[in-house]
Amino acid sequence: MRAAPPDLPGSQTTDSPLDRALALLLAGEREAALRWSAATVDRDPQTASALILTSRLLADAGRSEAATEGFELGMKRAIDAGNLPIAVAAVGDLRALGVDVQKHLDTIAAAFCKSSPRLSDPAMLPPPPLPDPGHDFQPLSSFLSGPLLLSKATQIIHEARQKYEALAGHDRALIAPVALFSQIERAGVRALIGAFDMITVPAGAVVIAEGEEGAEAYIVARGELEVRRAQRDAEPASRATLETAGALPEGAEPGSLTDLTLARLTNGALFGEMALLSRAPRAASVVACRPSILLVARRDALEAVAVARPEVGVELAAHCRRRMVANLVRTSPVLIAVAPEERPALVERFETRTFEKGDKLIAVGEDTSGLHLIASGEVAVVGEDGGESFVISTLGPGDVVGEVALVLRRKANADVIAVHPTVTLELPREHFLSLIQEHPAILLSLYSLAVQRDEETSSVLANSTTSLADDYVLV
């Protein structure tokens, strides 16, 4: 059974000629890679990623002039296609050749910034073309090698530039806004894109590993990756249910650890940025399905940008909060009781809270400050027996904390402590009453959860000298 989202119409399900070129490059087969990438440009001179790969191979072979021509053209084609990451990648290659890239960075920033006249409502833009199946695609002849191959690739780049220049009198295409970048004005975008470097990864490469601490954010310039989370499959009795739902991969045994595919990331996707807001371990892995070109920025580089351009830091924090809210809207058991269209406005009542490792969200014997939805990180519910503390349960993103004391109107009977740096959205106690009055379904959901958790917790505390079940939860 499939444990991944279904393939979408028009999605890439087989290696493209450019995939082949990237794979050959990563394997060190540079001439073979050039035959495939240059042939891709010859077939479709609008393909920015092929222009950039061909130019990179020319640069490696010492053809700097042709490479510069190709990188500059690739940047322009990428902008016209609305692919900011590929445009930035091209500028990175130009910088490596010693080219002054200031005007190129300004061009990208002007195209994608908040006030750009080229930005348009995505609904008004024509749909992107379907991927070329490439059934009749042929790379350049294997008889071409050495200087002859380089000259042919140079000619293809030059002809591609001539075709672009022939369109000089036409209006440039409108493009869709890009998350985060198109919420910032030109100078801020200029500073932000300068923080990113380009990397190329092969199929199967683990870009982010679940459980590791992260300090980087990534953008997919070209390629496809999967977000995967390790999970322990259900008990044998649940096999049929899991297989029917497609949640148990074929050949996996219930009770074993398997990877559940949560999402696919394609061109333009920004991921890993939550590590910039929280130093919690990564909640999932990200693995390349195809050879991919990525942009990467480290936390310290982005923090330097935020210091120099405070508006960038403000928007980056707002972007991360929007992402947290969007995730909680989809996954929080509290919000599921509310109609989907009402959830975003409801979450806006919550305040963002950050906790360092060891901080207490809730203290035993005290009133809770409010209801917490865990956005990132991890907390431990801690009880005490004979003067010794023990962990009753751990809770992570999507879980709710504090509902027992609020709903049952009593003091907390356990500590809740941040295991890692943690970010929550908190609904203050004084706003809780108005929330449940407006949305009684939330009260019903929380009451059921609170009673269940309270009963389980009482059982654990009463028998704390015996082994503790991992799924007992107290909040």
Regions found by a protein language model. Give the residues of each.
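Cytosolic regulatory regions built on CNB/CRP/Popeye-like sensor folds
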Residues: 2-23, 27, 31, 38, ...
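Short acidic/polar micro-motifs centered on Gly/Asp/Asn
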Residues: 55-59
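N-terminal assembly/attachment segments of tailed bacteriophage virion structural proteins
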Residues: 46-47
